């Protein structure tokens, strides 16, 4: 394992994720934001966390949470611990396998996706509001949050909800130069040989 490669990934990702999370919090807390209308309880949770701990602390912990989740999911994908890859594309593809399957109407039963999640993902992919890229990002976000919720049952320390983290999930995860793309590239099969890559 190349510890310098992983260390560089962690330092670069931390700054990028902090900026992304801070921007998402600002957008979510705007008066009349879609999140305020659709998820008022989580929005209030987020506001309470900021009031209790301060904005910097919430940004830092949320960025840290998402970095750890994405790295853990990459490790689990490489090691075959997920029924289908959650953050990793299949060979020759560009989208994570879970999203490619969902676009075909296939939802692995091992993830236990609720009817509501499946319907929302299919509705968004079939032509909900926004551009094609935005719809794809929104559908992937739904899947990613549902997977984290599922794994939270067994690993709450890693995938449990913290300060409404699902509400401020980093955007642009499917972009070529995204933090997720860097994680997938830098945490290759060789790097994932040992669980130390997560430490």
Where are these regions (language model features)?
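Preference for the N-terminal adenyl/adenosyl cofactor-binding alpha/beta module
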Residues: 1-199
